[in-house]
Swiss-Prot record:
This is 3D-(3,5/4)-trihydroxycyclohexane-1,2-dione hydrolase. It is an enzyme of class 3 (hydrolase). Mg(2+) binds at D493, N520. The gene is iolD. It comes from the Bacteria. One of its GO terms (biological process) is L-valine biosynthetic process.
Length: 644
C-alpha cells in the first residue's frame, strides 16, 4: 500500500479535487470551489493547504459567513444539485454564522459542504479564543449546533477519521433523496496534524446519481388510481427541475389533459405560457391554480414536499373524494397526506405512467375549466399590472390597514409607485433568459403569482426556509453558476438590511449582479399578517421612536439605499416612477459592474390572497375584539382542513 504524508487539511483539499458526479452519462467535477473567511481557527490549517495546492478548486473570499454559504447554496440550486461549493470559516462566531445557511440548505434539500473550524481536540489551550465552555460537557463546542440543521455531521478529532467522514459526506451530498447541508467540523490543531494517508483515498471517485425506477406494484396502483379520477391536478415541485423532468411533465399534461400548478421551487421548470400551466398554487398561488385545486379529485404531487404554503395549511383541496398520489425520490416526502407512494425519479415515473395510461386511452373530464381559469387569471394579472395610486380615493390591494395614511408614505418615499405595477414592468423589460432570485417578504407571493417565466430555470426562489438576506448572496451564487446570464436579486428593504455583504464579493469577482430593491419602509409582509389577524401595526413599520409616546410610532424613516451601495462601487439608480424604472432597467443591462435600483413603492400595494388560507398561531384569548374574531375565523378554517 502506497501512502502520502499530508496534513489533515492538505488531504481534505486533495480529496475534494477528486470528486466527480455522473448524471445521465454526463460526468463533471462535483466541487467547483470553496468560499473562505479566514480566522485563527482555519487560516494556518485549511488556509495553508489551499495556499500550497488548491488543485482545481476556485477559492473565493466571502464577506459574511452566512452570506457566502447562502451563495454556495444558490450555486448548487441553480446547478440542479449536480455541482456544489464548499465553505470554510473560523471557530466560534464565524462558524455560528453559517448555521442559518445550513438550515436553509437542508430545508431545501440543496447540497452544501460546510467546513467550520473548531476548538482544539487536545484541549491543551482550553479555553481558546472564541470557545464556549459548557460545564456539563467539555466536548461541546459552537459547532454542535450544526447537528440540528445538517443532513450529515461529523467532527475530525484524529487525522485518520477524515477518510470515513468524507466518504459519508459525499454519500449524502450526492444522494438526491437525502441531500442538504453536510458539516465536517475541523479542530484547528487537527487541521495541521500529519498522517500517512493511503493513496487509494485520493483516487478519482465518480458518484453516479441514479434515476430510481418505480416498482411494478406502486406503478400499477398509481395507474388504477388515476384512471378512476375525472379531475386530477398535478403539482410541479422542485424535484421536476432537479430531475430534469420538465419535458415529461409537459407530455403527461398534454396527453391526458391534466393541468398543473407550480410550487416556488418548481416554478419555471416549464414556461408560464404553457396551456396546462396554471401558475403558482397555495397560499401564494393565483386564482387559476387554487380554483382548480379546490375541485380536484386527485392531487398528483411530483417532487414536492407539500409545505403549508403549497397546501394552504392542508385546507386547499376541498373535494370530498380527493386523494393524493405522490411521486418523489424521497420516501419521507412521498409518505405525506396519506398518499399513494411512487418512490422514484420524477422523469422515469412519468415516462412509465405515460406508457401505461396511453394503453387505457385515459383522459381527464375537464372541458373548458382549464382555459377559463387561465383566462380569469390573465384578466386579473392585467388589472394588477395597471394599478396606479390615485390619491384619497385609492383602495390598496391589502385594504383596511393603511388606507388613511398612505399619503404619509407618498410624502416620505417621494413615490406613488404600486408594487404590482413595478413587477409587471420589470417582467416585461428583463431578457427572457434572465434569472430572478428571491426568498422572503411579500415579493415571493407576488412573484409566484405574477411572474411569467418565459424560459426554463430562470425563477430561483428560496422558499423552503424563506431566509431573509438570501437574495443578494443568492444572486451571486446563481451568477457563478450561469455567468453568461443577467441575474436579478428581487429583495425588499427589510431583507436587504439584514444581509447584502456579498454584493462586495460580486464586485471583487467581476460577477455582475443586479439588485432590484423594493423599499416600502417596513417589514410589509408581516405587517399584513399581524393587521390581517386583528392586531394593530406593531414593530413592523420603519419609524423613528416617538419621544412623547416612547414607541416606534414616529415619522417614517427615509433611507437612501442607492447612495449607500454607490459607496461600494455599485452602479445605482433612484426610482420613483415607472418612466425612471424603465430607464434604469435598460441602462443597467449596459453596465459591466453590479447595479442596484432603489425602487420606492407604497406599502399595501402587493398582491393579496386568492382562495387560500394560512394557519398561524393567533391568540385564543385577547382584549381585542378583532383578535378574537380572527381566532374564531381560524377555528372555522381548521374545521375545513385535514388534521395531518
Amino acid at each position: 500500500m502506497q501512502t502520502v504524508r499530508m496534513t489533515t487539511a492538505q488531504a481534505l483539499v486533495k480529496f475534494l479535487n477528486q470528486q466527480y458526479v455522473e448524471f445521465d452519462g454526463k460526468q463533471q467535477k462535483f466541487i467547483k470551489g470553496i468560499f473562505t473567511i479566514f480566522g485563527h481557527g482555519n487560516v494556518v490549517g485549511l488556509g495553508q493547504a489551499l495556499e500550497e495546492d488548491a488543485g482545481e478548486l476556485e477559492v473565493y473570499q466571502g464577506r459574511n459567513e452566512q452570506g457566502m454559504a447562502n451563495a454556495a447554496m444558490a450555486f448548487a440550486k441553480q446547478k440542479h444539485r449536480k455541482q456544489i461549493m464548499a465553505c470554510t470559516s473560523s471557530v466560534g462566531p464565524g462558524s455560528a454564522n453559517m448555521i442559518t445557511s445550513a438550515a436553509t440548505a437542508s430545508a431545501n434539500n440543496i447540497p452544501v459542504l460546510l467546513l467550520p473550524g473548531d476548538v482544539f481536540a487536545t484541549r491543551q489551550s482550553d479555553p481558546v479564543l472564541q470557545q464556549i465552555e459548557q460545564t456539563h460537557d467539555l466536548s461541546i463546542s459552537t459547532n454542535d449546533a450544526f447537528r440540528a440543521v445538517s443532513k450529515y455531521w461529523d467532527r475530525i478529532n484524529r487525522p485518520e477519521q477524515l477518510m470515513t467522514a468524507m466518504i459519508q459526506a459525499m454519500r449524502v451530498l450526492t444522494n438526491p433523496a437525502d441531500t442538504g447541508a453536510v458539516t465536517i467540523c475541523l479542530p484547528q490543531d487537527v487541521q495541521g496534524e500529519a498522517w500517512d494517508f493511503p493513496d487509494y483515498f485520493f483516487q478519482k471517485r465518480v458518484h453516479r446519481i441514479e434515476r430510481r425506477l418505480p416498482t411494478k406494484a406502486s406503478l400499477a396502483d398509481a395507474v388504477e388510481m388515476i384512471k378512476r379520477k375525472k379531475k386530477p391536478v398535478m403539482i410541479c415541485g422542485g424535484g421536476v427541475r432537479y430531475a430534469e423532468a420538465a419535458e415529461e411533465l409537459k407530455q403527461f399534461a398534454e396527453t391526458f389533459h391534466i393541468p398543473f400548478g407550480e410550487t416556488q421551487a418548481g416554478k419555471s421548470a416549464i414556461e408560464s405560457s404553457h396551456p396546462y400551466n396554471l401558475g403558482g398554487i397555495g397560499v401564494t398561488g393565483n386564482i387559476a391554480a387554487n380554483t382548480i385545486a379546490k375541485e380536484a379529485d386527485l392531487v398528483i404531487g411530483i417532487g414536492t414536499r407539500f409545505t403549508d404554503f403549497t397546501t394552504a395549511s392542508k385546507q386547499l383541496f376541498q373535494n370530498e373524494e380527493v386523494e393524493f398520489l405522490n411521486i418523489n425520490i424521497s420516501e419521507f416526502h412521498a409518505n405525506k397526506l396519506d398518499a399513494l407512494k411512487v418512490i422514484a425519479d420524477a422523469k422515469e415515473a412519468l415516462l412509465v405512467l405515460i406508457d401505461e395510461l396511453q394503453v387505457m386511452d385515459y383522459r381527464s373530464s375537464y372541458t373548458v375549466e382549464i382555459a377559463d381559469a387561465k383566462e380569469a387569471w390573465e384578466t386579473e394579472l392585467s388589472r394588477l399590472h395597471n394599478i396606479r395610486f390615485t390619491g384619497q380615493d385609492f383602495t390598496p390591494e391589502v385594504e383596511g390597514h393603511f388606507d388613511g395614511n398612505l399619503n404619509e408614505y407618498v410624502d416620505a418615499l417621494g413615490s406613488q409607485l404600486t408594487q404590482t405595477a413595478v413587477i409587471g414592468q420589470i417582467n416585461t423589460l428583463l431578457d427572457e433568459d434572465a434569472i430572478i432570485v428571491g426568498a422572503a417578504g411579500s415579493l415571493p407571493g407576488d412573484l409566484q403569482r405574477m411572474w411569467a417565466s418565459r424560459k426554463p430555470n430562470t425563477y430561483h426562489m428560496e422558499y423552503g426556509y424563506s431566509c431573509m438576506g438570501y437574495e443578494v448572496a443568492g444572486a451571486l451564487g446563481a451568477k457563478l453558476a450561469e455567468p453568461s446570464k443577467e441575474v436579478y436579486a428581487m429583495v425588499g428593504d427589510g431583507s436587504y438590511q439584514m444581509l447584502h455583504s456579498e454584493l462586495v464579493t460580486s464586485l471583487q469577482e467581476n460577477k455582475k449582479i443586479n439588485v432590484l430593491l423594493f423599499d416600502n419602509s417596513g417589514f410589509g409582509c408581516i405587517n399584513n399578517l399581524q393587521m390581517g389577524n386583528g392586531m394593530g401595526s406593531f414593530g413592523t413599520e420603519f419609524r423613528y421612536r416617538n419621544q412623547e409616546t416612547r414607541k416606534l410610532d414616529g415619522t417614517i424613516m427615509k433611507i437612501d439605499f442607492a447612495a449607500s451601495a454607490a459607496g461600494y462601487g455599485v452602479k445605482t439608480y433612484h426610482v420613483t416612477s415607472l418612466e425612471q424604472l424603465q430607464e434604469a432597467l435598460i441602462d443597467a443591462k449596459k453596465q459591466t459592474v453590479s447595479t442596484l435600483i432603489d425602487i420606492k413603492v407604497l406599502p399595501k400595494t402587493m398582491t393579496n390572497g386568492y382562495e387560500s388560507w394560512w394557519h398561524v398561531g393567533i391568540a385564543e384569548v385577547s382584549k381585542s375584539q378583532r383578535v378574537q374574531a380572527a381566532y374564531e375565523s381560524k377555528v372555522s378554517n381548521l374545521q375545513q382542513a385535514r388534521s395531518y
